[in-house]
Amino acid sequence: MKIEVNNELISRLQNLALVELNDREKERIKRDIKNILDFFDQINKLDLSNVEPLFHPISTGKLRKDEIIKPLSRDEALSNVKRKEDGFIVGPATYGE
């Protein structure tokens, strides 16, 4: 399935993400999304019929150590949120779409 990366898609993503983008940012996002989708198209064209599936993509087992860090307070977490109400993020309505 080929996804058309156009201004309509960028506007939809902008609304879903609750961000405002200027024209320059929209063009950059459009270019970046197109590059990402083109990369996935290249991956989809690879012949992987003789490749054994991996159980886990990191086969070395070298993962970073878990470290306990101080979590953000509610005020810190909501400091950059465009729409909030009673300490919660208000997102776009998705029911009925």
Curated annotation (Swiss-Prot):
What Pfam families does UniProt report for this protein, alphabetically? GatC
Q: Which Cys-Cys disulphide bridges does the record give? A: none
Q: Which GO terms describe its biological process?
A: glutaminyl-tRNAGln biosynthesis via transamidation; regulation of translational fidelity; translation
* A GO molecular-function annotation: ATP binding
**Keyword annotations:** ATP-binding, Ligase, Nucleotide-binding, Protein biosynthesis
Q: What is its EC number?
A: 6.3.5.-
User: Which enzyme class, named as a word?
Assistant: ligase
* UniProt catalytic activity: L-glutamyl-tRNA(Gln) + L-glutamine + ATP + H2O = L-glutaminyl-tRNA(Gln) + L-glutamate + ADP + phosphate + H(+); L-aspartyl-tRNA(Asn) + L-glutamine + ATP + H2O = L-asparaginyl-tRNA(Asn) + L-glutamate + ADP + phosphate + 2 H(+)
Q: Keyword rRNA processing, does the record have it?
A: no
Could you say which protein family the record assigns here? Belongs to the GatC family.
- Xref: HAMAP family: GatC
Description of how the protein assembles with itself and partners: Heterotrimer of A, B and C subunits.
- PANTHER family the record matches: GLUTAMYL-TRNA(GLN) AMIDOTRANSFERASE SUBUNIT C, MITOCHONDRIAL
What does the record give as the function of this protein?
A: Allows the formation of correctly charged Asn-tRNA(Asn) or Gln-tRNA(Gln) through the transamidation of misacylated Asp-tRNA(Asn) or Glu-tRNA(Gln) in organisms which lack either or both of asparaginyl-tRNA or glutaminyl-tRNA synthetases. The reaction takes place in the presence of glutamine and ATP through an activated phospho-Asp-tRNA(Asn) or phospho-Glu-tRNA(Gln).
What protein am I looking at? Glutamyl-tRNA(Gln) amidotransferase subunit C
